[in-house]
Each structure stands twice: as structure tokens, then as C-alpha cells.
Amino acid sequence: MADDPSAADRNVEIWKIKKLIKSLEAARGNGTSMISLIIPPKDQISRVAKMLADEFGTASNIKSRVNRLSVLGAITSVQQRLKLYNKVPPNGLVVYCGTIVTEEGKEKKVNIDFEPFKPINTSLYLCDNKFHTEALTALLSDDSKFGFIVIDGSGALFGTLQGNTREVLHKFTVDLPKKHGRGGQSALRFARLRMEKRHNYVRKVAETAVQLFISGDKVNVAGLVLAGSADFKTELSQSDMFDQRLQSKVLKLVDISYGGENGFNQAIELSTEVLSNVKFIQEKKLIGRYFDEISQDTGKYCFGVEDTLKALEMGAVEILIVYENLDIMRYVLHCQGTEEEKILYLTPEQEKDKSHFTDKETGQEHELIESMPLLEWFANNYKKFGATLEIVTDKSQEGSQFVKGFGGIGGILRYRVDFQGMEYQGGDDEFFDLDDY
């Protein structure tokens, strides 16, 4: 995950788009004054400008005065945004403009335009009471998806792994006769029945695989991993009943000691090299490397907001690791009496304590200059500190441990740093303040 800085930057871009989608999906407006415009890479700005001029003419006929004015206002905003571009950027252009209604019931104008992190091959123009983000969501879900078939003597499980998400698509159990010494003339008949049931089982698995992993005549996964404890997986991979299109996608056969969901987890673990570009594995590796630094006590690690920010300021952080749902806010306050700026990092619990926002001596309230989630601030500023930012989930065991045990924020350092020996002036202040340093 960290070996390729461009991949890490791309992950930050993906996180930003996920965050944007979340806020756009939640936004609602009155009437149809919210415009979603997506221009694919090879389109012409002039064509879109003409289309908008035509739309402006059509919108002038809307009967409701309020709706007419807000739609015309939104179209004008989009036209203004387009004037900033001579041509469509290489990856296309996404524009959202309109008036939304906030939770307090106030109206607020939204104007967003950006080039996505990879080509968006969708053309879209919609006026509605909400923003349409389906094309952006599709852009994110284009990560490689891998199929897993876990097959043993007691049943089969079909699943997929995409990015950090694993999903069980289907599973069924089977009751196959065991080999036994019941004998005499019946031995051959028993063996024949066994082979027949086994054959039918493999056929059922092969047919189910086609239903799940082939859609519209095409294989819908980037690769397949066959896993199992007996030789069923080998039998399936070599069987004539197994669809040729799927056969060509088999990446690996994996021996596992369990069936079902435990087997699925084990199969993911054992296919690591094959799926090394899947984020789930990369995340485990990255946090594993972080834990190694800690267990070997190399001193090349930091955790918690305070130490991590100290290390960033020193330029010591090579990889900054942050949990995607980190709920710490960064506040920049202006102290009225001293005219100094103060920076606080507070959890939702600490935010409730209003004493953080007032002067201890005078009781005067500090002026709020800026507030934003700390992760968002990192996403905008990590390059200034020469670090790579990795945004992780708590879906893997390591990720969950990182969030619960280390607060979801830490870093792998370029060199050993002794945080104990770096006492701050005003060490009694429990909040880390960059200006004190």
C-alpha cells in the first residue's frame, strides 16, 4: 500500500470523492433547481455550453416563479463554472450547482466542479431536487473484484473480495456418502453411487459458479481463487463441466483446513501474493508493518494526535496512517486578549466542554477562525510534511486493533524519535498546540 506513493495519493482522492458523494447525497433542494452535469473526456465544452443556453430558454417558461428563478440561477452558475475551462480535462469534468436547504431550513448555494481521479465515461445533465452521484459511485466501485469458491466434502461457498469488502454470495451444504467397507457384491455399487453423487456435486458447483460469476456473457470478476480441504478444487478446475471462461480466470488453488466462512477468510489470507493489489491485503500489510515497528521497539513509530503532529512538524513521518472515520476536529481559534492563534484537536466528547473555547483568565470567548475534521486537514496538507497518507478501515483484524488500541491515528517514521525527551513549554496543557512548539 505504501510502496507506491501514486497509489496512496489515489486512495486519498478516492476518500475525498467518497466524502463528497456522502454530502451530495444528503443534500436536498426545493423544486428542480439542483443541476448534475457530467462531461466525458472527449466531449466539447462548446457543445455543452450550447445545450445549457437551450436549457436556459426552456427553463424561462417554468410557471412557478420561485422555481423558475432558482433553476435559471443554477444554470447560470454552471455556465460560469464552464468558462473556467478551455477544454474538457483528460478525465472528464463533473459539475454540481444548485440551492440546497440546510438542516436549519436555510437556503445555501452549492457550486462544485472538479476533474475525477480517473476517466468518467458518462454523459449526464439533470435538473432535480437532489444531486445525482451514481456515476461517481460507479467510478469508485471499479476496483478489481475477485471471486472465491470454497469447496469441500460438506458444502460450497461462493464469495467476492473487492477492495476492503468481502461478500458471501451463496452457500449450500451437501451430504456425500463416505467410503466404507460394506462389502461383498455391493462394494462396486456403493463406489459407483459415491462417484455419481460426487460428480453431481461438482456439476452443481460449476453451474452455480456460472450463475454468480458470469453476467451478460462476460466474467464479472478479475480473477478466481478455488479453495478447499480435499481434492474437490482440483477436480473442479480440471472438470469439463467447469465453464472455459471461468477456467481461464483461475489465479490460484488454495489448500485450507476449514470450510464455509472460516475457509473463505483463510483463502483470502493464503492468496495474498495473487491479490496483492487488493486494498484489504495492502491494509493488513501496512498496519502489520506498523505493529512490527512497535513490537521490535525501533522507535520509528508514533501514535495519538499529539505525537503524530510533533513528528509531522519535524518532517519525520514517512507514512501517516489515519482511520477513515476518525472523529477528531481541528479548531483554529483567535484569542481576543493576546491576539494569538490557538489550534485545538478535540473529540466530540471534548467539544461539549465549552471551556476549551474561552480564555481561562478573562472568561472571554475565543473567535473561531476555522474548524474542520482532522482527517480532511491531513488530506489537504499531508504533502507539505513530505509524508504519504494512508486512510485505513477497521474491517480487517489489524485495522480494528489499530483503531481501538491506537486511537486510529499514527505513523511510520523515517528515523527514531524520542517523544519522551521532547517536553513542550506549557506541558500542563492537555491539548497539542502547534504554536507552542
Curated annotation (Swiss-Prot):
Q: Where, per the database record, does this protein carry N-acetylalanine?
A: A2
Which one Pfam family would you cite for this protein?
A: eRF1_2
InterPro entries found in the cross-reference section: eFR1_2_sf (IPR042226), eRF1_1_Pelota (IPR005140), eRF1_1_sf (IPR024049), eRF1_2 (IPR005141), eRF1_3 (IPR005142), Peptide_chain-rel_eRF1/aRF1 (IPR004403), Ribosomal_eL30-like_sf (IPR029064)
Report the subcellular localization: Cytoplasm
Crosslinked positions for Glycyl lysine isopeptide (Lys-Gly) (interchain with G-Cter in SUMO2)?
Answer: K87, K404
User: What is the recorded post-translational modification?
Assistant: Methylated at Gln-185 by N6AMT1.
Write the record's keywords in alphabetical order, separated by commas: Acetylation, Cytoplasm, Hydroxylation, Isopeptide bond, Methylation, Nonsense-mediated mRNA decay, Phosphoprotein, Protein biosynthesis, Ubl conjugation
What is the name of this protein? Eukaryotic peptide chain release factor subunit 1
- State the organism named in the record: Homo sapiens (Human)
